[in-house]
Amino acid sequence: MSKANSFNKEDLIACGHGELFGEHSPRLPIDNMLMIDRITKINADGGEFGKGEIVAELDINPELWFFKCHFDGDPVMPGCLGLDALWQLVGFFLGWEGAEGKGRALGVGEVKFTGQVLPDAKKVTYKLTVKRKVYRKLVMGIADAVMEVDGREIYSATDLKVGIFKDTSSF
């Protein structure tokens, strides 16, 4: 298992194909649904609660697919994509720690949107701090996070929950 503390886009794509942490590890989405270009920091004992943290980035440019369809004449990154990126990162964290299975978002306590990502922005930064890790029959991560655009916080989310399942057929 890789215990690197940063990952580039190629690494994240490899994770989406089951090639980074192993074929049974949780996978990131691929292609347009991968909302992360790099992870600049990941550790198992940092963050506000001392249980781990992740800092990741997405480069923004006017040609990104969602600006072409959300909305015509008023392009803005859908808030749900930023929220999904935060869940992606919780699942990635669990795979990085060695969990095996399929990742599924299980919920979020509270989400606040106080800004937007427009085509002229340069960079989105995601900052997560892990609150709880459960390694029993159900593997689950719970984290709080913020999303910034060009250094300004625009989203916050509490209690992001991701579970890792050996079998999702009855989920």
Curated annotation (Swiss-Prot):
Its main location: cytoplasm. Gene3D superfamilies: Hotdog Thioesterase. GO terms for cellular component: cytoplasm. The active site is at residue 70. One of its GO terms (molecular function) is trans-2-decenoyl-acyl-carrier-protein isomerase activity. It is found in: Cytoplasm. Necessary for the introduction of cis unsaturation into fatty acids. Catalyzes the dehydration of (3R)-3-hydroxydecanoyl-ACP to E-(2)-decenoyl-ACP and then its isomerization to Z-(3)-decenoyl-ACP. Can catalyze the dehydratase reaction for beta-hydroxyacyl-ACPs with saturated chain lengths up to 16:0, being most active on intermediate chain length. Belongs to the thioester dehydratase family. FabA subfamily. This is 3-hydroxydecanoyl-[acyl-carrier-protein] dehydratase. It comes from Shewanella woodyi (strain ATCC 51908 / MS32). The lineage of its organism: Bacteria, Pseudomonadati, Pseudomonadota, Gammaproteobacteria, Alteromonadales.
